[in-house]
């Protein structure tokens, strides 16, 4: 259980303020290290830590042995055996601004006497990435992996040997000839971005709680009491330091240590360099910053270490960190602010997204006033309310997002978000289909927010095939308010088109000719051109074939639409909602007005003959021995069956041939009868 936050003292007396800061930092440490549920952004923690350091510097008598400034935070969680580190796993001091790095380099140079020479001799550093994961120590005895432990409080950690044994990148036996008697390898367990996304996909599919970020996923996976669960989690590891070493001499430099680790078969990250002086340090930092977002894993800074081991020993340690190393952190990617309102915005595909309006906050190198909340379910899951103090995250060019709300700071007048029922842009109904997280505006042909997307889709080759109507022309037509709906395209004249930027007279005439040609189409193409969600070319053809003309489709109930080949509940509901929106019907009437778009009408398809498979749904998958897919389909339909393209609970039979794939697996999962070609023939003959 998380420890209850304590309110800040009413007085500003140093003793009381320091006591509160220690309590708040210890509470945050417990949440971060023990519960794996961090509730304070790094930037806020750093700010409080620096304030406590400042008070203790000014008032040394207030320093107590268990102050967070005197040790690394965290305690061993129950359920794991404690492990005492022979060589403490210390944390690093932090630098944030370029000036901090210049000052660090000067301190090191002064202490080593390099600045006293003329000219000064630049210090040699090993520069590497600061991973956003979980620090661990691996012990090898005579080259065999025997133990893994977390950092814990720096002196005592947790025994996670069985869990770490499941991480494939960690060797269980070291390679090469230079293997020591005892070696403690220090490094970081982390989860790559792609693996994190796949893990959350599995969590969603299993209807289990998703992880907030790769670090939480890595920490939670490593500290599972059941190592079988850890084995299913895609964890990775990078080596970057050393603890105990027995049986051979310590490498002379840090860079040589990492080279030796590679010889032993230990994972070592390639994004590292040996640099000289403050200029070299800052050059490495800014180079990494430029490619940070493209890296396949999360980092929150870089680490500088004096490269030579003898110089490291000369510099020594302070109580909680080495003097020879520094973590240079990127601008905070998370910060606290107040959520003052939640609006919704409509995207070009009609997606209606809640957007948080925030009190301005500087995060990720920019001032942020808006952040995405993704969808209504996310707002509910995170329990985010108007008036909350929230954690906002901004990473590089990624759209800022609200990570969570601080429930202990929730005001009494905080209000829940209510998704509007009508589009704020056009007034059309907002609908959310079953099993979909995104709500959408149903005014696809009318809504200004969706205008460009609707026009682009309408002109596609597989739709009305309006040659010459590309994205740049559509942009101009919309931005100059010349076209509001697809119907307005047929009002365009030569003079209007010829005035468009970079649109010659010949291009204008070609587009007019193409628009004239587009007036003569087919019902299937017209249906597809409307841009109804979930209605592709195949479904458009099935609708045209089944109903024969447009009016019956526009007036069809969901039940009537479900009778169409390959139309399931989600697609049927989407079609029904589209035609139920009056704005869409108005545009359609404008499109098929006299002199506009026409197509040959046809009779509705005859009802399927009553046969041995009347009312049954069959799915074909794989390659049958003697029948082509189309032949088998015709035989089944002739017997009254509906041949569907996907397996669902409504499927009655699956006919599987060679190389049957996911459809066969789904059928077996749902317990649906599976037949081969002979079984299908017997079914058609009424023998099954």
From Swiss-Prot:
Classification via Gene3D superfamilies: 5' to 3' exonuclease, C-terminal subdomain, 6.20.10.30, BRCT domain, DNA ligase/mRNA capping enzyme, Helix hairpin bin, Nucleic acid-binding proteins
Location of the BRCT domain: 608-688
Protein name: DNA ligase
Matching PROSITE patterns: BRCT, DNA_LIGASE_N1, DNA_LIGASE_N2
Chain sites annotated for binding Zn(2+): 423, 426, 441, 447
Amino acids binding NAD(+): 42-46, 91-92, 128, 151, 188, 305, 329
EC assignment: 6.5.1.2
Cofactor section: Mg(2+); Mn(2+)
Keywords: DNA damage, DNA repair, DNA replication, Ligase, Magnesium, Manganese, Metal-binding, NAD, Zinc
Purpose: DNA ligase that catalyzes the formation of phosphodiester linkages between 5'-phosphoryl and 3'-hydroxyl groups in double-stranded DNA using NAD as a coenzyme and as the energy source for the reaction. It is essential for DNA replication and repair of damaged DNA.
Residues at the catalytic site: 130 (n6-amp-lysine intermediate)
Record's keyword annotation contains DNA damage: yes
HAMAP family assigned to the protein according to its UniProt record, in alphabetical order: DNA_ligase_A
Top enzyme class: ligase
One of the GO BP terms on file: DNA replication
Keyword Magnesium: yes
GO molecular function: DNA binding; DNA ligase (NAD+) activity; metal ion binding
Family membership: Belongs to the NAD-dependent DNA ligase family. LigA subfamily.
Reaction equations catalysed: NAD(+) + (deoxyribonucleotide)n-3'-hydroxyl + 5'-phospho-(deoxyribonucleotide)m = (deoxyribonucleotide)n+m + AMP + beta-nicotinamide D-nucleotide
Pfam families with a match to the protein in the record: BRCT, DNA_ligase_aden, DNA_ligase_OB, DNA_ligase_ZBD, HHH_2, HHH_5, Nlig-Ia
InterPro entries: BRCT_dom (IPR001357), BRCT_dom_sf (IPR036420), DisA/LigA_HHH (IPR041663), DNA_ligase (IPR001679), DNA_ligase_AS (IPR018239), DNA_ligase_CS (IPR033136), DNAligase_adenylation (IPR013839), DNAligase_N (IPR013840)
Superkingdom, taxonomy of origin: Bacteria
């Amino acid at each position: 259980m998380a420890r209850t936050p304590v309110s800040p003292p009413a007085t500003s007396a140093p003793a009381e303020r320091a006591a509160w800061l220690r309590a708040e930092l210890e509470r945050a440490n417990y949440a971060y290290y023990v519960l794996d549920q961090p509730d304070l952004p790094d930037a806020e923690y750093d700010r409080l830590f620096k304030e406590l350091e400042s008070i203790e510097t000014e008032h040394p008598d207030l320093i107590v042995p268990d102050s967070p400034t005197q040790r690394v935070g965290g305690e061993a969680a129950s359920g794991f055996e404690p492990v005492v580190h022979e060589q403490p796993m210390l944390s690093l001091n932090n630098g944030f601004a370029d000036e901090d790095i210049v000052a660090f380099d000067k301190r090191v140079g002064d202490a080593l006497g390099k600045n006293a020479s003329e000219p000064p001799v630049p210090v040699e550093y090993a520069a590497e990435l600061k991973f956003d994961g979980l620090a661990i120590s691996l012990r090898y005895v005579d080259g065999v992996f025997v133990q893994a432990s977390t950092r814990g409080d720096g002196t005592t950690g947790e025994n996670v040997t069985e869990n770490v044994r499941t991480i494939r990148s960690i060797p269980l036996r070291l390679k090469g000839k230079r293997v020591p008697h005892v070696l403690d390898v220090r490094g970081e367990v982390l989860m790559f971005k792609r693996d994190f996304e796949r893990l959350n996909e599995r969590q969603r599919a299993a209807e289990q709680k998703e992880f907030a970020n790769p670090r939480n996923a890595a920490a939670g996976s490593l500290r599972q009491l059941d190592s079988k669960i850890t084995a299913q989690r895609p964890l990775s590891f990078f080596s970057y330091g050393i603890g105990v070493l027995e049986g051979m001499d310590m490498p002379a430099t840090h860079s040589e240590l990492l080279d030796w680790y590679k010889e032993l078969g230990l994972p070592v990250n390639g994004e590292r360099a040996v640099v000289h002086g403050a200029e070299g340090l800052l050059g490495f930092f800014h180079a990494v910053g430029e490619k940070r977002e493209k890296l396949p894993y999360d980092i929150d800074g870089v680490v500088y270490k004096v490269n030579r081991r003898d110089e490291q020993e000369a510099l020594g340690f302070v109580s909680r960190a080495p003097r020879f190393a520094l973590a240079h952190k990127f601008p905070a990617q998370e910060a606290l602010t107040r959520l003052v309102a939640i609006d919704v915005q409509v995207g070009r595909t009609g997606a209606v997204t809640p957007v948080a309006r925030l009190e301005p906050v500087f995060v990720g190198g920019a001032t942020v006033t808006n952040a995405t909340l993704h969808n209504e379910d996310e707002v509910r899951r995170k329990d985010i309310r108007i008036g909350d103090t929230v954690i906002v995250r901004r990473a590089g060019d990624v759209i800022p997002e609200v990570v969570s709300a601080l429930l202990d700071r929730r005001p009494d007048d905080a209000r829940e978000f209510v998704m509007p029922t009508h589009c704020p842009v056009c007034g059309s109904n907002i609908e959310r289909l079953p099993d979909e997280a995104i709500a959408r505006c149903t005014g696809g042909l009318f809504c200004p927010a969706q205008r460009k997307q609707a026009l682009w889709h309408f002109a596609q080759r597989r739709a009305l095939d309006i040659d010459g109507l590309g994205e740049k022309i559509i942009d101009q037509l919309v931005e100059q308010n010349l076209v509001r709906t697809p119907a307005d395209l047929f009002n365009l004249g030569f003079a209007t088109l010829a005035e468009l930027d970079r649109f010659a007279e010949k291009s204008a005439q070609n587009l007019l000719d193409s628009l004239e040609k587009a007036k003569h189409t087919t019902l299937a193409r017209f249906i597809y051109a409307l841009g109804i969600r979930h209605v592709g070319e195949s479904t458009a053809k099935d609708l045209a074939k089944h109903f024969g003309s447009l009016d019956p489709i526009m007036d069809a109930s969901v039940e009537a639409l479900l009778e169409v080949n390959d139309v399931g509940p989600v697609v049927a509901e989407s079609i029904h909602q589209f035609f139920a929106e009056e704005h869409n019907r108005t545009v359609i009437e404008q499109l098929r007005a006299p002199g506009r778009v026409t197509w040959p009408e046809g009779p509705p398809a005859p009802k399927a003959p009553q046969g041995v498979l009347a009312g049954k749904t069959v799915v074909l998958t794989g390659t049958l021995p003697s029948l082509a897919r189309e032949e088998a389909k015709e035989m089944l339909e002739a017997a009254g069956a509906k041949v569907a393209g996907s397996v669902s609970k409504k499927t009655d039979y699956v006919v599987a041939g060679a190389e049957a794939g996911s459809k066969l697996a789904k059928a077996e999962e749902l317990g649906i009868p599976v037949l081969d070609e002979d079984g299908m023939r017997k079914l058609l003959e009424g023998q099954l």
